[in-house]
């Protein structure tokens, strides 16, 4: 699972951040990325079909529009997990921690 998280995190960081960010910008970026992860996790818990997740998540977005590009990537990552793992883990906290560690 960690390899999958790292690969997804790297791809998402490239998609949204571009050049190296200053510390505060990095924190903001990681916070928005974590919000995307939390929204996708909630969609999975609400049993939204995988193909309907992008529209459902974008409708409730609380982050800048540029972070919407990560929704398909995060969706596939969350939906390949077992439901018990999605239920018992705080995926957004794990994502944010790994993002800040980069």
Locate each region found by the language model.
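Positively charged n-region of N-terminal signal peptides that target proteins for export
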Residues: 1-4
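Bacterial N-terminal signal peptides
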Residues: 7-15
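N-terminal signal peptide c-region/cleavage motif recognized by signal peptidases
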Residues: 17-19
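Cleaved targeting-peptide boundary
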Residues: 21-29
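Extracellular/mature segments of secreted proteins
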Residues: 36-43
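Compact alpha-helical subdomains of small soluble proteins
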Residues: 44, 48-102
């Amino acid at each position: 699972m960690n390899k999958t998280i790292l690969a997804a995190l790297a791809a998402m960081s490239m998609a949204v951040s571009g050049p190296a960010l200053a510390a505060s910008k990095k924190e903001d970026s990681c916070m928005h990325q974590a919000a995307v992860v939390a929204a996708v996790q909630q969609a999975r818990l609400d049993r939204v079909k995988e193909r309907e997740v992008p529209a459902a998540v974008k409708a409730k977005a609380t982050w800048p529009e540029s972070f919407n590009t990560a929704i398909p990537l995060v969706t596939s990552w969350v939906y390949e997990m077992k439901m018990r793992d999605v239920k018992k883990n705080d995926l957004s906290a794990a994502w944010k921690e790994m993002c800040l560690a980069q």
